[in-house]
Each structure stands twice: as structure tokens, then as C-alpha cells.
């Protein structure tokens, strides 16, 4: 066992403070990673504050991890010491259910093991995430980071990136299609970048007129102000696919008339109950509402390679580990464009 400096929350109403956790000695299939950067996700805040009622304290958040290989288990032959690698939202799964057999570990029928606040099958203990100096992970769940990507900007790709890439890829977004990205935040800004890189006409859909300029800077071909009823009416039936990144409950069916016949809106932002469903725009257009989590390991590697080919990273603000509590406050006030990334290498010793 080795120790790792980290920051942890010890109660729902306490700030994150310096802490230490133990990491297992790398096994034959393990990779020991020195963490350079870790993105900050809204999920981190939810777990730190026990918003979902299942946090195990102390908790060390962080599932957008980029670092370099410190040590390798004897069976790991395709990585080398010093290589830049990444770890995303989960570090284990059952490996044998139909989902895992089809490279969709995120939908493991036994439940995947989250990178933090999960139960390690091998050790029977709680997993600790990337707000930490180092981590030990099974090779299967370690990803290769293209050499041309900025490592800090690449960190949010492990959650915000794959959360938006996976549904766009699954629903076949390509040139000749029109895609609407609803909401401009950590997820929405990645949705714009990916949809545009896939060749689709990309429209940012927002209630905030002041976000229009930034949406176009990120690559949006157009901006639809959803509070402009006349403009919305003109766009009815024009979209092949809607990527809904709004993080809070809302009337999802209010957007459905924007879709073409057989169009799909995929929800990736808001988890849990929402307003009552009006089925009329679905039935009178054979439209669909769907949801998507993150991607499996194979697809996440594909996404990273796609980002390398298209020079895609997240728009970020780098912070020190010691500033994490203030960063949480700013995130809750929507005061970041568009993801915070912790410089672990320069913050923890």
C-alpha cells in the first residue's frame, strides 16, 4: 500500500480539506498513475454535499483524470513509464454481462464501479478519485491521451466530452444533418464542438441572448433564442437531433416541435423527475425522447482519438487544489467558462 495526498470532504456541510488516502500496490494488470490534472464536474459537488443521499465519507471526488504512468503491472505491455494516460468515470465493471461484452461498461448490468464513492470489488473498500496525487487503476479502464492534446484541456473530455460525444455518435450525427444543442455550459460547449466536427449544421438553443457570441466562437452556425416565439416557430420541424444539456428539471416536451419527423431529443443534463410529459408532439411526428450516460472504454478511447484528429479540448480555467471550495461556489453560480481543471501536479506534494 502507498499513501496519496488529496483533498476530501468529511461531511455534507464541510469544505474539502487536505487528507491522505491509501492506494493499493499495483497488481499484474494495474497501472499506477501520477495525476497531473483533474477536471471538476457538477457530480463532484452533488456527492461532496450528499445531494443524492449515498455519499460515503470521507469522499475524494474527481473522475476527469489525466496523468502519467509511474509504474506498470507485469502483464501490462502496451503502455510505458511516463506515457500520458487518462481515467474517466468508472474503474471496474463485471466484465461478463451483455453490456460489458459489447463494450458498454457504463451500462454494466451489475453496476460499474465509480472512480470515487464506489465499492472496489477487489479490495472491498471505497474508491477515491482524482483530487489526489496518484491513483492505481486496472489497465482495462486506463485510456491513452493523444500526444497533441493539451493535458489540462483534455481532462474534462473524460466526462463532459464523452457524455456529449456518445449520443451524437450513437444517433449518427453527420454532414447534412441539423443538430440543436440546448444549453451552453460544460456539456453544451462540448456538444457544439463535437457536432460541428462531425459535419452537422449546429445550432445553439438558449434562453440567454448574451450567450450568442460565445456559442458562435465555439463553432455554432446559428443561435436560436428560445424566448423569441416567432423565431422558434420558424424553426419548427428543422432539426434532426437535439442534445439537451440543461442540468435542472424543465419542460422537455416544449422543444419537441423543433424536431423533424422521426427526430430524437437526447437528455444528458437533468437526472431524475421532470415535468409531466405531453405526448402529442411525439405521436404527431413519430419523435423520440431518449437519454444517454457516458461511453464505454472503447468509445471513450475513440472519442479521445477523434479529439486528437480535430484538435478538440475543453475551454477551461485552471485552479490550484487549495481553491476547490471557491470553485464549487462559482460553479453553483454558473461562473465558469466552461470547466474548472485542478493542477494537481503543482498543488499537491
Show the residue positions of the predicted features.
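C-terminal hydrophobic helical "lid"/dimerization subdomain
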Residues: 2-4, 253, 297-349
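Glycine-rich beta-strand-centered segment in the early N-terminal region that forms part
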Residues: 24-38, 51-101, 106, 128, ...
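Short glycine-centered segments of the SAM/dcSAM-binding site in methyltransferase folds
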Residues: 84, 178, 263-264, 288
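NAD(P)H dinucleotide-binding glycine-rich loop of Rossmann-like/cofactor-binding domains
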Residues: 94-182
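Adenosine-nucleotide cofactor-binding segment
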Residues: 175-184, 196-254
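N-terminal Rossmann-fold NAD(P) dinucleotide-binding loop
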Residues: 188-189
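Helix-to-beta-strand junctions that scaffold the AdoMet/dcAdoMet cofactor pocket
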Residues: 259-260
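Rossmann-fold dehydrogenase core element
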Residues: 264-266, 277-317
